[in-house]
Structure formats: structure tokens, C-alpha cells
Amino acid sequence: MAADKPADQGAEKHEGTGQSSGITDQEKELSTNAFQAFTSGNYDACLQHLACLQDINKDDYKIILNTAVAEFFKSNQTTTDNLRQTLNQLKNQVHSAVEEMDGLDDVENSMLYYNQAVILYHLRQYTEAISVGEKLYQFIEPFEEKFAQAVCFLLVDLYILTYQAEKALHLLAVLEKMISQGNNNKNGKNETGNNNNKDGSNHKAESGALIEAAKSKIHQYKVRAYIQMKSLKACKREIKSVMNTAGNSAPSLFLKSNFEYLRGNYRKAVKLLNSSNIAEHPGFMKTGECLRCMFWNNLGCIHFAMSKHNLGIFYFKKALQENDNVCAQLSAGSTDPGKKFSGRPMCTLLTNKRYELLYNCGIQLLHIGRPLAAFECLIEAVQVYHANPRLWLRLAECCIAANKGTSEQETKGLPSKKGIVQSIVGQGYHRKIVLASQSIQNTVYNDGQSSAIPVASMEFAAICLRNALLLLPEEQQDPKQENGAKNSNQLGGNTESSESSETCSSKSHDGDKFIPAPPSSPLRKQELENLKCSILACSAYVALALGDNLMALNHADKLLQQPKLSGSLKFLGHLYAAEALISLDRISDAITHLNPENVTDVSLGISSNEQDQGSDKGENEAMESSGKRAPQCYPSSVNSARTVMLFNLGSAYCLRSEYDKARKCLHQAASMIHPKEVPPEAILLAVYLELQNGNTQLALQIIKRNQLLPAVKTHSEVRKKPVFQPVHPIQPIQMPAFTTVQRK
């Protein structure tokens, strides 16, 4: 659409000049000749006719406008800066602003406004372009049919780019009606006229081809809108129309691949992408779209959804390389540094997708477990998309992951003595055991540089999380806000599946209430609530790591007050609040948070869309497994989460010298999990309790065996039934730190 918009606008301008009222026959002839020369591509002749018109009528700004457009097309649409400057001068000359458009006089200036909207569109100033386009749409009735369609198509494209799919569908319905009525009117005229003329039949065939092309374009826009709305049943119907009208062209196959991707048919989506003939595409110099870049990016997204993250990052890097090659070719044509938009076709101003690809790479690298590489990608992307709270959260997660041990390192330490015994010194009677320190809190991460410098530190993570909270709308920061129970799809708190995974269902009644979050999908009401919970949980963790216990307690309390809180984040909220309270010497309050009965659910709150996505499938058509797994740092069950609470509760009782209660908590927790799953912190707690009880030999045996003694286990098993009996066998999990649950 971007490539043919300027052509439409130029043709309309010249025709409008030729039909102006109160002109002489000479002016009318010059105007007609200029228009015909323009439509045939003879821009030199067109400019000559316009120069003659300018000599006759020097006060008509429309002639200057048409001259600027003709010169723009003569340069192969490479003088965008000159056209933009001329449009601004003409706008100041007619003393009109978009907000003041309210009369027929402004309708006469519609070409000027439309041209300005097209320029804004290519400069990615979509909000301003929509403002101009919507003003034009108010006066669409007096416009000629072709120009009215151009305005509508421009607005549809802008609505889809800004994720306003409902508005786009409304305009597409208007366009369908407009094309249908125009076709009927033409058929009526042809019936009354003489159709034996060869030129008339050619014109009729050409007109029919244009109508079919417009209908095909409408079907493609409908598919894009339905994909954004996740309305897959309606999308399936439109996909058939697209394939019937556009055939196996690259755009139609890409749309169908996107549709199959949303349905979960990832292999079919890959097959459709591979079947597209990219070589037949006109190229980015004519369309502004780098199809190879889109191809690799789409493959990366599909493999990300399949949890094949290493393959995904491979394809994203290929897309980045392709994008950089294209940008290098485009920058080679620019000679004047003062005119950054000139020297290349205007449509190529939309070609560069570097920052969108960097965003994708960052999310992919974060899932792979390479937080530093992910940080480098996202910190570059945030310079462009600095108003995206989700992006700031991802940056903070990179900092958190970079400043804690990896999952493999943490898991390797559990079955060995490395997590308990640091070294052994001395010999014989003087032989001593040096226990490993488990304290990782209050670490000074800053090495003297400003925390505002973008490095993957915990101080910078705190800044990122503060930015994310400030970017959330104020109405979402009220925990007493109405829950909005009509939303049917609840999404996860702290995991991002893909760029489209967090898009709300079209069934939501709050579909038009969202905040933009480019380059990913916009944040709807329910997603904002989930996002805020994730930000608060991360903020509490970072504050604890930095030793800011009051701030950590504040964030944890706010997290627990949220009306829609997943079980896993509620579990984290209680643990973070308890740790902050213990550091503040408010142990009694901490014990309240560490009550195992507080844990009734450890779900991530992710509600898959499989039912909605699979509802339009055939009976024998199965949904592919995405292979997604819940993060291993979360307890796998309520039982294991309560075990963590009991271990921490035992620590709290030790601080109050209530050793009997601490021992009871330890034994109760140990009876609920496999001996190999007991974390080193729990073994150290048992050693501490035995030393306090004067049982030095028993403490040494615990250290030697690296597990709780069988006698201790037997004592708890004597009871007929544990307090928290596991319903099913507990799978091995990665236990968190003793009073800190680390999270990805």
C-alpha cells in the first residue's frame, strides 16, 4: 500500500486542478494535458504544462502542490525532504491547521492534508497521520471515489499499525460498500452507453481489474485485523478469500503462515513460509519491504514458540544481517547529510526493522540463559521504544539473571558438599570444618560508577523497574480498581512467550482500552494488571539484593494487595515480605507471612488460548505441543512451596531462639520431600540446631552425610499422617536460597 499511495495522490491532484471552477479554456486544456502527461509517466512534459499554468495563475497554491508532486515522481520518489518542505510551506500559506478543518473550504485543501498524512506515515509518525486522516474522513462524501478509497486505505493501514483492529474493520466495511456502489454505478452507465467502442471495453477491463485488486487488498487487511484480535474463526474465512484472489503470492502465504502460527500448527507455518517464492517479490526498493528479513524473523518467532530458542536466535541473527545489508545499500544512495530522508525512495523509509529485531533477539537470548547478550540487544532497543514498560521489565530481568548464579550452577551444588563445607583445616585433634557462607544479600554490586550508566547491575535494574512502574497508567495503579471479571483469558505474570502471546482475546469488552507497547503488541487491561504484579515482584527482589529492606517490604505489600495475583507471585510476595521483615527485626510479622497455609496455589496464571485457537479446527486435526515449560525456579506444586515456607519458618524461629519450633518445622518439611531434594540451607539449619542443643557429634554426622539423619526422618514418619501429605510423587525441583527465592 505504501508504494502506490503517492501515485494515487499525484493523479488526484492534477485531476482536481483541471476541474477547478472559474477557469479559462486555455487553463483547462493545460490542466488536462498536465494530468495526462503525469498519468503516462512523462513528468518533464507535465512540469512544462504546470509551468505554463503557473504563469497564467500565480496565486493558485494547488499548481505549486502539483509541481512538487510531479518533481517528486520525476526523481523516482527520492526527494522526500523537498516535498515535505513544500507541503509545510503551503500549509502555512493557506493558514490552516488540522484542528480547524470544519468547512467546505477545507475540503478543497484535502489533497494537501492527504499528502501530509502520507509523509507522516512514512516517517512513522502514526499518531499525527491518524489525526490528519480522521479529519479527512469526516468530509469524505464530497470526495471523488478514487480519492475517498485512498483516504480509507491509508487510515486502515494506520489503524492496523497502531493495533486498532476494530476501527480498521469498520473502515473496511465502508470500503466494501463504497466499491460495490461504485461498481454498480459504472455498470449502469455502461448499459445505457455504447459499448462497441474498443477504448471503452479496454477501460472497462482496466476498471474491473482495479476493483478486483481493491477487493483482494481488503481481504488481506481483514486477515491482519482478525489476527491482531485473535479472532481465528473469522480469520479462517478471510484466508480462503485471500488465497482465491491473491493466489500463492508471498503476502498471502505469509498471512496464512501467521494464521497457522497462532493456531499452534508450527510445522505447517514453517512449510508455508518455505513455499513462498521470495524471488518473485519486486524488492524493497519498490515496496519498502525486505521479504527476506521478514522470512527469517518469522522463522525465529515460530521456533521461539516451539521453545527451540537456539534455532530461534539463529534465525533472528540472519534477519538482522539481512536488514543491515539492506540498510547499507540504502545509505549508500544518500549524499546530502542535511537531507536524511532523501536519496532513496520514500517507501524505503519504513524498511529498517533493526530495533524490532533487536527486541526479538533480546527476548530470545533471555530465554536461552544469556542475560548479558540479551541486555546488549534490549538496551539498544529501549533507546527507540523507551515508552514500553514491558521492555524495561525485560531489561531488569537481564540484570537480575546476570547477577545471580545460573540454574545449572545452582543445581550442581545441591547433591554435593560444596554447598555446605567450604574447606577443612588442621589435622587430628585440631581438625576444623569451615562451613560455606550462604549469605548473598546486601552485596555491593556497584563498583563506584553511576547507577544510571546502562550496565547489567542490580542498581540499574532498580532504575528500569522504576521506569516500568511510572509508565503504567494511573488507573492501573489502584489495587481497588474493578476487577473486570469479563476478561476470559488470564495471562502469565513474568514470562513472555512471544511478541503476540500477550495479546488479549477479541472477546474482551475492553478491547479498545490499551496502551501502546511497540514493538510488541499493546497492553490491554488484564495484561497491565499482570505486568504490574511482575514489576512489583522484581522490584521487591532487587530491593532485597541492594539491602533496601523498607522499599522491598513496600513493594511486597503492594504486590500482595493486587486483586489479580497469580499463585506463584503470591508465594514470592510472602517470602520477600518475610525476608524484609526479618532484616528489619520484625520477626513476629515475618512469621505471619511464612505460614504454610498462605500457599494454596503456585500456578503462573498463564491461561493458554488453545481452546480458542483450536475451536475452528476439524475433528481429526490436533494441536501441536509448543513444548513450553514452566520456569524451574518456581516450586512444582503446592506441597513443595509449603516445604520452602517451612524451611524459612524454621529459620525465623531460630532467630527468636525457639529451637523446638524450628526443629519441628525442619522435620515436617523434610518429611514432605525426597532426601536428595533437601537444600544445603536446610542441612545447615539442622547443624545449627544440633549445635545449639549440644549435639556436636550429631552435627558432624549431618555434615559428613550431607543429608538429614535417618533418625530425624524417622521421627517425623512415626506420625500416621504428615500435616501436608503430597497428593502425587514430587518431581525433583531446584530449591531456592534459604530466605530468598530467586526468579528468572
From Swiss-Prot:
Q: Does the keyword Transcription apply?
A: yes
Coiled coil (residue ranges): 74-107
Give the top-rank taxon of the lineage listed in the UniProt record for this protein: Eukaryota
Query: Has UniProt tagged this entry with the keyword Ribosomal protein?
Result: no
Q: Which residues carry this modification: N-acetylalanine?
A: 2
UniProt record similarity statement? Belongs to the CNOT10 family.
Q: What is this protein called?
A: CCR4-NOT transcription complex subunit 10
Q: What organism is listed for this UniProt entry? A: Homo sapiens (Human)
